[in-house]
A protein has these predicted regions:
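Walker A (P-loop) phosphate-binding loop of ABC-type ATPase nucleotide-binding domains
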Residues: 43-47
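Helix-to-loop junction immediately C-terminal to a conserved catalytic motif
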Residues: 56
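Conserved ABC transporter NBD signature motif
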Residues: 64-75, 79-80
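Conserved ABC ATPase "signature" region
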Residues: 104, 108, 115-133
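Catalytic Walker B motif of ABC-type/P-loop ATPase nucleotide-binding domains
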Residues: 162-166
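ABC transporter nucleotide-binding domain
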Residues: 178-269
Length: 321
């Protein structure tokens, strides 16, 4: 797991606004991302892809500003472009083209001269595990191989930062773990990464910081590395009886954080000073039966649920989970 260590912020957002066809898509994004690997989360339509496209210069900024590695995306486009590598979610290869030719072409488009671009194409394809298949046509590749080829073209020119859009999408467990291992290795080499994914487990396994978008706004920014070091426990409770909402309110008054789910289920973040017996005692006082209590597998799941409940209306939750 990587830890944030660079003095230069990965991304600084200051009221960033983007309108497409007159419709607001990004609505005043503000926040500082300093991690080595930052997870970008949000439901469909939250603005994740629009944010990537804006950072890459595909969409103009309508208001506010954004700085990537200290470079203003509106005024430093030429100096910023060689610093970024982009792995899109959708297929981006050219049918009939070999992997090495494709990666070489992308490296040239990123600014490398032809000869160094070819050398880096071979290196990148060997690095991701496609060395033996580098002369094969991309349209004969499996889905997992195509994903690796997209990663190779993103790193071939030696960027300082990667934007990865759903890099494990559609992969089987083995290929998924291979991709995540590569992401961690790349980050450990000093390359900064923003990883957009709908798979919370992938984000939790790779990222030291996370930003969650909702309805084009920042719902929360959290330090996952600090959360891993904390002693808080994450529980899931199945309850029956009692006045609706009384038990969650009592837990909040105790210092817990609570997300209410369907069918009277609760996700609860319990501080170190509170023991499980106290949860049962308060349930009894509220006339609530705790029918099941189990440890939750994911602290990030709590964060995401809380952000979806409370974020996105102009207020930003930066308190973690």
């Amino acid at each position: 797991m990587t830890e944030p260590h660079s003095a230069v912020s990965l991304l600084e957002l200051d009221g960033l606004e983007v309108r497409l066809a007159g419709r607001p898509i990004l609505k005043g994004l503000t926040g500082s991302l300093t991690g080595q690997v930052v997870g970008l989360l949000g439901p469909n339509g939250a603005g994740k892809t629009t944010l990537f496209n804006t950072l890459l210069g595909f969409h103009p900024v309508s208001g506010g500003s954004a700085r990537v590695l200290g470079h203003d995306i509106s005024s430093a486009t030429d100096s910023l472009r060689p610093l970024l590598g982009y792995m899109p979610e959708n297929d981006s290869y050219i049918a009939g083209m070999s992997a090495v030719r494709f990666v070489r072409m992308m490296a040239e488009l990123a600014g490398l001269p032809p000869r160094p671009a070819l050398e880096r194409a071979h290196e990148a394809l060997f690095y991701v595990g496609l060395g033996e298949a580098r002369y094969r046509k991309l349209d004969t590749y499996s889905l997992g191989m195509k994903q690796l080829a997209k990663l190779a073209q993103a790193i071939a020119h030696g960027p300082r930062m990667l934007l990865l859009d759903e890099p494990t999408n559609g992969l089987d467990p083995s290929a998924r773990q291979r991709m995540l291992t590569l992401v961690r290795e790349i980050a450990a080499s000093g390359v900064r990464v923003i990883l957009s994914s709908h798979l919370l487990r992938d984000v939790e396994s790779c990222c030291d910081q996370v930003i969650v978008l909702k309805d084009g706004r920042v719902a929360t920014i959290a330090d996952l590395a600090a959360e891993r070091r904390s002693e808080r426990r994450f529980l899931e409770l199945e309850t029956r009886g009692g006045e609706n909402g009384s038990y969650p309110r009592a837990l909040v008054a105790l210092g817990c954080e609570v997300a209410e789910l369907a069918n009277r289920r609760l996700k609860v973040v319990v501080p170190p000073a509170v023991d499980v017996q106290t949860l049962y005692r308060i349930a009894g006082e509220q006339g609530v039966e705790v029918r099941k209590l189990s440890s939750s597998r994911s602290s990030l799941e709590h964060l995401f649920l809380r952000a979806m409940e409370t974020g996105g209306e102009g207020s930003v939750d930066r308190a973690g989970l």
